A protein has these predicted regions:
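Non-catalytic, conserved peripheral segments adjacent to functional cores
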Residues: 1-113, 137, 150-153, 158-159, ...
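Conserved metal-binding segment of the jelly-roll/cupin
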Residues: 115-129
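Short, structured patches in soluble enzyme cores that scaffold and shape functional sites
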Residues: 97-99, 126, 144-148
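His/acidic/aromatic-lined binding-pocket segments of jelly-roll/cupin-type domains
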Residues: 83-86, 121-122, 133
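Ligand-binding loop in jelly-roll beta-barrel domains
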Residues: 127-143
């Protein structure tokens, strides 16, 4: 008998996401004036952890639309770099994360799901297990920023058993 774990997707917030990385958004934050007073510089994130010798990469992701409920079949992590996704064209997207268990695999019993908006960027901390990007409502275009070596060290994948996966509900 299948034993899927059902996750309820919560609105993405900095507090709920803090143990996995950071949410970068204006929200109700105030900044400091820059550019002769024509702009506000609002603090985003300063935790841009990456291994020495890794090269900075900025790529574009165009993500096809998925529907809820969504079945997660794979989680990945980037042990040597944080990874930032910044919306360029986006309504909503799904963020699925899991802490690392004692066996160094994702702890699926404590996985969480969030729904982010087009006004929220996310920074996964280095080594954080997460699902690949999932677009809701429409195609999503994001920039992805991280540091890479260009080999297998950059990404580890964990495939979930088909009958013991995660299903995200609205």
């Amino acid at each position: 008998m299948p034993a899927h774990r059902m996750l309820h997707a919560h609105p993405l917030s900095a507090d709920l996401f803090a143990s996995f990385g950071s949410v970068i958004e204006i929200g109700n934050k105030t900044g400091r004036p820059v550019n002769q007073g024509r702009a506000q510089r609002i603090k985003g994130t300063r935790d841009l952890a990456h291994a020495a010798g890794a090269a900075p990469v900025v790529d574009l992701y165009q993500v096809e639309t998925s529907k809820l409920p969504f079945t997660v079949d794979c989680l990945e992590r980037h042990p040597l770099s944080c990874q930032i996704f910044t919306p360029m064209r986006c309504a909503r997207y799904l963020v699925i994360v899991a802490p690392t268990g004692a066996d160094d695999k994702p702890d699926l019993a404590h996985a969480l799901a969030f729904i982010g908006s087009g006004e929220q960027a996310i920074c996964y901390g280095a080594g954080v297990w997460h699902a690949p990007m999932v677009a809701l409502d429409d195609i999503v275009v994001m920039t992805m920023t991280m540091w890479e070596f260009g080999d297998a060290r950059d990404c580890e994948e964990f495939w979930l058993a088909p009958d013991h996966g995660l299903v995200v509900q609205p």
